[in-house]
Design a protein with these regions (language model features):
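Aromatic/histidine-rich interaction motifs
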Residues: 1-6, 18
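Conserved small-residue packing positions in alpha-helical repeats and bundles
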Residues: 8-9, 106
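Short, Lys/Arg-enriched, Trp-marked, Pro/Gly-tolerant hinge/linker segments that flank
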Residues: 10-75, 88-100
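Short, charged alpha-helical segments
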Residues: 20-23, 130-134
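Terminal helix-turn-helix DNA-binding modules in bacterial transcription factors
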Residues: 56, 60, 64-69, 77, ...
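Proline-centered helix-kink/hinge sites
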Residues: 94, 142-143
Length: 161
């Protein structure tokens, strides 16, 4: 809970993703509630069709600002149910899933020669630093390095002497 609280504090003091802030808030609240009341927040597990619907929503709105309320309203569930079931079924939080979608979109833009700063904006990242951090964490490369790998020209047959 301490590391989640510190991350939430960092996200609040910086301009960052609202979806991640909301997720951390609900995770912390659920943990604290369970610890200090000796009960846990019971949430109804989502059906796989609801998870698929949430995924489709995230995929089709990936470049937009998305909140937990948006997703929950779409699939008619509570925030705690969404986070818990999504994580259990996919191994990622809704935010983690959204970040993976955005990075895949950015990879497509980078392969097309679009500058990293523009690829970040077009794929839904609010700022270059956040984009670079997430991209590096998920791919192991910086956006510029990734682009260089894909934009290197293959040697032509005329170059071999």
């Amino acid at each position: 809970a301490c590391s989640a609280f510190l991350e939430l504090h960092r996200l609040i003091t910086q301009r960052s993703d609202e979806l991640r802030k909301e997720e951390l808030f609900y995770v912390l609240f659920s943990r604290l509630f369970g610890k200090y009341t000796h009960t846990s927040l019971q949430s109804r597990p989502l059906r796989s069709s609801q998870i698929k619907e949430a995924c489709k929503y995230l995929e089709s709105h990936a470049s937009e600002t998305i909140t937990l309320d948006d997703i929950c309203q779409r699939v008619s569930v509570s925030k705690s149910s969404l986070i818990r079931s999504f994580s259990k079924q996919l191994g990622l939080t809704p935010h983690g899933y959204l970040m993976s979608i955005r990075v895949k979109e950015a990879q497509t833009f980078l392969k097309q020669g679009i500058p990293p700063s523009l690829a970040a904006l077009k794929s839904g990242f609010a700022d270059q630093a956040h984009f670079s951090n997430v991209f590096n964490r998920l791919t192991g490369l910086t956006p510029g390095s990734y682009q260089n790998v894909f934009l290197k020209k293959a040697p032509s047959s005329n170059d071999s002497d």
